[in-house]
Design a protein with these regions (language model features):
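Acidic, serine/threonine-rich low-complexity disordered tracts
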Residues: 1-55, 75-171
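Acidic/charged, solvent-exposed loop-and-adjacent secondary-structure segments enriched in E/D, K/R, S/T
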Residues: 56-75
Length: 171
């Protein structure tokens, strides 16, 4: 399974842009294991990268903040299938850093999107990465909450069609 991620975050305050974050990421997965990654990102104009490939004995990463081999089964930080909640190591798709995380189910709640209410289950991610993740009743990832430079940010998936959780289950 090939996953392509293209992100641009440009928050504005009083009409002024105060930062810009971009990420272009290509991941190849097979049997729920990452085979390769090629990611480039920019934050406040500084460039970051991650390149990696599965090899005998683990997954070799060359990144702007970490280079080495990870032997554990891990997740990445660009897409959040519910299976990732069981994995204790997540690799930053910004700079390659292995992140030790813990997960905790919070609660079910309602969120509104396009004038329609949805029931979601919210999870807290803590440790080297702090965020909340939301999944709908079909286990599709539909939202996130995190902090960007001291400011709370909320992400809600605009298009619920073609969510890759079904594809992930069969990969």
């Amino acid at each position: 399974m090939e996953v392509l991620v293209d992100v641009e975050i440009t928050p504005k305050f009083l009409g002024l842009k105060f930062m810009k974050y971009t990420l272009e990421n290509r991941e190849v997965w097979k049997n729920k294991k990452l085979i390769s990654i090629d990611a480039n990102s920019s934050w406040f104009g500084k460039r970051y990268y991650v390149k990696g490939r599965r090899e005998e004995g683990g997954f070799r990463i060359e990144g702007s903040a970490f280079s080495g081999v990870i032997k554990d089964t891990f997740a990445t930080t660009s897409y959040f299938t519910p299976d990732f909640l069981k994995r204790r190591i997540w690799v930053s798709t910004q700079d390659g850093t292995p992140l030790e995380i813990k997960t905790r189910k919070l609660r079910n709640r309602k969120v509104s999107f396009n004038d329609k209410d949805y029931s979601v289950t919210e999870w807290e991610i803590s440790g080297d990465l702090e965020l909340t993740l939301q999944y709908d009743q079909h286990k599709n990832w539909v939202g996130s909450g995190f902090t960007v430079g001291n400011y709370p940010a909320r992400f809600i998936l605009n298009n619920r069609k073609n969510n890759i959780h079904k594809i992930w289950q069969n990969s």
